[in-house]
Amino acid sequence: MSVPAKLGFVDKVRAHLELLDPVTWISVFPCLAAGVMASGAMKGTVHDYLLLLAMFLMFGPLGTGFSQSVNDCFDLELDRVNEPTRPIPSGRLSPKEGLANSIISLLLAIGLGVFTGLHVGGVRGMIIMASIMFALFVAYIYSAPPLKLKKNILTSAPAVGFSYGFAPFISANALFGDVRPEALWLASLNFFMAIALIILNDFKSAEGDKDGGLKSLTVMIGARNTFLVSFTIIDLVFAVLAWLSYTWGFMIPTFFVLLGLVLSMVIQVQLLLDPKGGISFMNSAVKDGFGNVLGKSDVHEHNAFLRYQIANNALFLVNNLIVAGMVGFKYL
């Protein structure tokens, strides 16, 4: 890919934003929203909305952005194969500029986390600060040697589950109220759902992972078995959510969670029968309606995952928010 010898200011800014991978920022918001709803303590004031915005900036553009930026810094050679159009391998940003991007994002995330934690105060404030600090630390060792957690799915998937699922949920829950057992249960389910989805997301880089010695599940056991492992985790998450909803006395939400489980399993069967072309009727949704958000891929299994992700995320998101809202309502 040919790149001008010197990019203009606007193009440099665009390259820095692309390095932070804005399409990934929104991934933490459902967990933040559910965490806040489960607290039942947020008030419709400007103050509380600003706190929620600070939490989103901390885990979204800054925290998630840092994880994407630092990953590109350490994976330059791998990205030349898997994603050669990214800012650093394409030459739009130098490795030093990429490093500066990640350092600035890290410092801003830490600063905002400390400020928010001190503002909230007490044990809740400590939970917020500890969550963002540990999430940032995990994001670093995910990509950086010598640990480089992403080298093996057994360490990379839990790292993603914590940073994208558990930590945002717990932090948002602590923002306005005490962290209760119900919140810990729901945060744990978000942790496992994130694990299940990141397993499937590795389809897009299977060839590069194999050449680079990374042990993704797809490389180790193949596409069909990877689908089977991920679907088992997803179905267990739905089943446990239904059980929790029932034991907490939420009868109507229990029905909707079970309905979501059944619908998800119907789609899963089609993908297991045809890992490359299953649920092809949703192709237009990926290419047109959601293509810019979810991304596109030349790998058939990854495109199948993108189609499934639309349906699964909608089913889990709605049920997760409903149950979290009922928990919060119980403590009003």
Question: What does each model-found stretch correspond to?
Answer:
Residues 1-332:
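Multi-pass alpha-helical membrane architecture of UbiA-family
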